[in-house]
Amino acid sequence: MKNLFIIIFTSLFLVNCNNSNPMMKQWSNKSLEFGGVPAFDKMSPELVKEAMLKGMEISLSDYDKIANNLDAPTFENTIEEMERSGKLLSDVYPYYGILSSNMSTPEFRKIQGELAPKLSEYSSKISQNEKLFERVSAIYNSSKINPLEDDQQRVLDLTYKSFAMNGAALNNDKKKRYAEINLELSKLYNDFSNNVLHDEENYVTYLDESQLDGLSDGFIKSAKKIAQDKGFEDKYAITNTRSSMDPFLTYSTNRALREVVWKNYYSRGDNGDEFDNNKIIAEILRLRKERVGLLGYENYAQWRLQDRMAKNPENAMALMEAVWPAAIARVDEEVADMQKVANKLSNSKITIEPWDYRYYAEKVRKLKYDLDSDEVKQYLQLDKLTDAMFYVAGELFNYKFIALEKGRIPVFHEDVNVWEVQDKSSGEHIGLWYLDPYARQGKRSGAWATTYRSHTTMDGKTNVLASNNSNFVKPAPGEALLVSWDDATTFFHEFGHALHFFASNVKYPTLNSGVRDYTEFQSQLLERWLSTDRVINQFLVHNKTGDPMPKELVDKIKKASTFNQGFETTEYLASAIMDMKFHLTDPSNIDVDKFEKETLDDLKMPSELPMRHRTPHFGHVFSGEGYATAYYGYMWADVLTSDASEAFAEAPGGFYDKDVAKKLVDYLFSPRNSIDPAEAYRLFRGRDANIEALMRDRGFPFK
């Protein structure tokens, strides 16, 4: 069964619909090339709303037909038919996703608020369809005696578990309450997201020319353009997004302004006004606990992790607690180094505060490693990084990316570009890759990857339509877009997700789903190719001279590879541990701000830095359920990443070794969710991963 609860991130097949609404017509473009593509250029909120409602109606009819089939249940007449159902809705979801994440407006947010409860009701009607579950159960029980083909058995097992985990076996009263809770949660998730977006759009810091000391020319030009676009001709705008906040805190010499920008960013959703998220979070936690209580679980984390690699919250916490002491010990060392620098540079004695950390860390980097992040940035051009990713994809996956001319493929914004993906050897078409790189009003913060259509072979081979989305500050006209090393790493990370989509070799749509603490592994692994010699020597060239990065600078980067790992690991772990602890505690009378503070105190969280995501804007966890009690998954996946990286490092051909690359594709990328992740990793590595490689990577001691 398609994962009915995160269907917003999937798309499957095409549908003919005799309706004037272009959102409800078969995906098409000139000559129906590339299997047809979404009509992004024809989107409007009202059209998408109409299509979503119709899609849900048709999909429910599809499921009812399956449930009411009088023939004895079989894999073919039940599970396969479920895999085929909801074609229109699957096609409409990309439009809904774009208007939610990339092109949000007040008009659409109102529609989103109307649709959220309807989507919840839609999911509940399927997951609580007794006749449908009876058919699935009959096939599942039969398979225990007469197992199906491996991929069929996997789909069946996932489908049965999805029903069971979502209340299909409850009595009618409990089913009713379960559905009511889902409905309430859907509204709260929508409100949470809109509140964060409000604060990101409305808390902008405007500077005058006297307040620009320390900032790069490129950043200043971008800030000027943003301010002009917002109607402030003689100002410079620092938007309330990470891509704007991070470089400002790193380079601005104005400590008072750093504090303002820092507080704006880390107070999103926590300003004590109508857009404050604390009461929403408390209610989300209470409802989640009540819902899993109906199923007999003690807490939400126990319910959620049963089908993850970690299996239970105890294992997830054990990993994080094993790394935490080394991380905060490293922070103490980093702060001591920064304090020495601050004492030398400041006329008056200061104590390192969170808005100082990035600024003084950069000073220490220069002193300790003679490494200037701004100097490195001159070699990190977004277009060259894109070429570098294509090169890596060619070497590992045998892919070729061909830029398509503007206007050939409909896009939702002029900044979006599209490439065709082909097999280098055969020329076989694999899919299309969309890139939406820049921040804009109405676009959610962060970086992400998604698919508009996934690969399957159930009813003929489908191509993949995948996208990467970033929030880089758009450069001034004629200027190169230069990014930080961290942002370049994130760019590679998200492209790793896209390659995971393109490499899929599964028959059934459900098998494109993922196990949350495994799906970040492939993307984190691809980050490692950014620092390979081939990428550095061929693609990291100076934006003015075109000269390759000098060896001396490369050596400095590699020598400083574990620099600031205390900060990076601690800010991440604090958020991941907080996520888990929120879902392990009794939320009956919880005060969210107080719980956050007390938990950080118990952890002995260094006061000089914040969590990566403070609770009131922790969208991974509270704008939906995708990462709820799952933020630990990045570290779980990083254990695999560090271990797998050593497999390449030890190979004769290094990170471009053809034999290891083939195993990478065959066992870690192509199967998607068709085999158990732990088994897949053992097929690749010959054993389970261990934590030692992770600790070595971060320069942490390990006993």
Task: Please give the residue ranges for each predicted region.
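C-terminal motif of bacterial Sec signal peptides marking the signal peptidase cleavage site
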Residues: 15-16
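Short His/Asp/Glu-rich catalytic/ion-coordination signatures at enzyme active sites or charged loops
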Residues: 32-47, 96-115, 138-180, 239-279, ...
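Short pre-active-site segment immediately N-terminal to the catalytic Zn-binding motif
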Residues: 473-492
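Catalytic Zn2+-binding segment of zinc metalloproteases
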Residues: 298, 496-508
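C-terminal, non-catalytic "cap/extension" segments appended to globular domains
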Residues: 20-47, 54, 214, 235-237, ...
